[in-house]
UniProtKB/Swiss-Prot annotation:
Pfam families membership: RnaseA (PF00074)
Domain of life from the UniProt record: Eukaryota
SMART domains assigned to the protein according to its UniProt record, in alphabetical order: RNAse_Pc (SM00092)
Residues with attached carbohydrate: N58, N86
Residue positions of the active site: H36, H143
Gene that this sequence comes from: RNASE1
GO BP, sorted A to Z: defense response to Gram-positive bacterium
Listed GO CC annotations: extracellular region
Natural source organism: Chionomys nivalis (European snow vole)
Name the record gives this protein: Ribonuclease pancreatic
EC numbers, comma separated: 4.6.1.18
Catalytic activity: an [RNA] containing cytidine + H2O = an [RNA]-3'-cytidine-3'-phosphate + a 5'-hydroxy-ribonucleotide-3'-[RNA]; an [RNA] containing uridine + H2O = an [RNA]-3'-uridine-3'-phosphate + a 5'-hydroxy-ribonucleotide-3'-[RNA]
């Protein structure tokens, strides 16, 4: 009888372990925003900044991400945008917020002749207002929507 119970519990334990292991490795939307769009340490005047950062942040694996923006402000300043002016997101959702002031950003755009695996980006340092989507409790940035 003990062996039968063990054989019944074993598949259940394997399923539970697999679920726990896969959920531990998942990146939240807020963590993805941090990885894709935050560089609080400051911008670089190097023309290769985007090439380095896109690779370092795993945005050139399997394909070249065409556009990305890095925000060079303290995390607290970017999180504060979630309580600023509410605007409509590009996709029509109503959870986007526009910064009151222009922030330091770097715009990375894939050069026209660039192809994977040799992703080559144009680096543009700018000061613009940012529009970000915010969600959760606490309310935090989860998506970079635009710069204006």
């Amino acid at each position: 009888m003990g062996l039968e119970k063990s054989l019944i519990l074993l598949p259940l334990l394997v399923l539970v372990f697999g679920w726990v292991q896969s959920s531990l490795g998942k990146e939240t939307s807020a963590q993805k925003f941090e990885r894709h769009d935050m560089d609080s340490t400051g911008s670089s005047s190097s023309a290769t900044y985007c090439n380095q950062m896109m690779k370092r942040r795993n945005m050139t694996q399997g394909y070249c991400k065409p556009v990305n923006t890095f925000v060079h402000e303290p995390q607290t300043a970017v999180h504060a945008v979630c309580s600023q002016k509410n605007v409509t997101c590009k996709n029509g959702n109503s959870n986007c917020y526009k910064s009151h002031s222009a922030l330091h950003i770097t715009d990375c755009r894939l050069k026209g002749n660039s192809k994977y695996p040799n992703c080559d980006y144009q680096t543009n340092q700018l000061q613009k207002h940012i529009i970000i989507a915010c969600e959760g409790n606490p309310f935090v940035p989860v998506h970079f929507d635009a710069s204006v």
